[in-house]
Swiss-Prot record:
Cellular location(s): Secreted
Name of protein: Conotoxin pc6b
InterPro entries reported for this sequence: Conotoxin_omega-typ_CS
Expression sites by tissue: Expressed by the venom duct.
UniProt GO MF annotations: ion channel inhibitor activity; toxin activity
Length: 31
């Protein structure tokens, strides 16, 4: 789950917005 910009993510987050990809988040997303 991505909560803030710059947080590392291991897998894509498509909840709310396309904010996370296999790497780093660029947008704040909720989910």
């Amino acid at each position: 789950t991505c909560l803030e910009i710059g947080e590392f993510c291991g897998k894509p987050m498509m909840v709310g917005s396309l904010c996370c990809s296999p790497g780093w988040c660029f947008f704040i997303c909720v989910g």
